[in-house]
Design a protein with these regions (language model features):
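Binuclear metal-dependent hydrolase catalytic cores
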Residues: 1-163, 170-176, 180-183
Length: 185
């Protein structure tokens, strides 16, 4: 498994000499292994992700705040009609996920209606996706403490485990659940 952090900032992207070491982009993490390219959130770092036409690309959203979805439409790879991109969130069902993306990237807020223009964006239920790919990897989620809700993800294949816990207002009562969830990562 190879994890690339394309963005780790919260709220707004920033570009200053102080952010050179870790970057100034908002949330976007790319995990590559086997036939898969998993992307966690599409903050401003998503514009730097090279979508791999030879891998199954799945975008998982931790939650729907602006800094976690704002660059979905700014990665030219999503406009390749031959490249299916699966979108899922353990936070809600596929209908609500599509509705949120549709609202965010449509007329009133954005110049194109992304979900209508791009038929290659495939919204899928988290549980269905989990079943479809269980022979290759196991993905779990954990509810986190964040306004509006948020989830963390744990991905495990035959060799490795990576846990991605993004926005969370830590409460000491979470310690054992977080420890168990992230164990052996």
């Amino acid at each position: 498994m190879k994890l690339t952090v394309h963005g780790c900032r919260g709220s707004i992207p920033i570009s200053t000499p102080q952010t050179v070491m870790y970057g100034g982009n908002t949330s976007c993490y790319e995990l590559i292994f086997g036939d898969y390219q998993l992307i966690f959130d599409t903050g401003t770092g998503f514009r730097n992700v090279k979508l791999d036409n030879l891998k199954k690309t799945i975008i998982f959203y931790s939650h729907w705040h602006h800094d976690h979805i704002q660059r979905l439409a700014f990665n030219s790879g999503i406009f390749n009609s031959k490249k299916n991109i699966y979108i899922s969130s353990a936070l809600n069902d596929k209908k609500e996920s599509k509705s949120i993306i549709h609202s965010y990237f449509s007329g009133f807020y954005f110049p194109i209606e992304l979900t209508k223009k791009l038929s290659n964006l495939k919204f899928i239920e988290f549980d269905d996706l989990k079943k479809d790919f269980e022979k290759d990897f196991k993905i779990e989620f954990l509810n986190l403490n964040h306004p509006g809700g948020s989830v963390g993800y744990s991905v495990k294949n035959r060799k490795n485990k990576i846990t991605i816990l993004l926005d969370n207002g830590y409460d000491k009562e979470q310690f054992f659940d977080l420890h168990k969830f992230a164990g052996k990562s």
